[in-house]
Amino acid sequence: NANRTQIDSFIESINSNYSVFDALKRVKISNDVKEFTHFTFEIIESGKIHCIAAAFTYGREDIIPEMFIEIINELEPANVHCNRLKYYLERHVEIDGDLHGPIAREMVKELCGTDKKKWEEVLNVGRECILKRIQLWDAIHDIIV
């Protein structure tokens, strides 16, 4: 039974027509979690489809399979019995790695074409997404350990 107070407060703020950015200011959560969410919605609000696709591709579809493989590899020798979690992780690795990742990369390629400025923006967004994801996971680690 996780404490959902801040999540419920955030959702309530959104439902009360606060912007995501203002709703984030109202909740008491880790600054790293706020930064990750804020950054994500800044990209969305930019309206630049190639940047949104880059965030999705390089901040999620391309890196999550590797992260989940590491978790699976650490669960097995530790003899941790989490069959549902393991199934969830393995399924994500299979779908994201074999299907979603390649399709997402193709989508970015299609959206950028030969436009050097778009490719530069995609590179910057991808790099920043990975850094924000690392900060998020470090914050989660600090909270639960």
Label the predicted regions.
Residues 1-145:
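Non-heme di-metal
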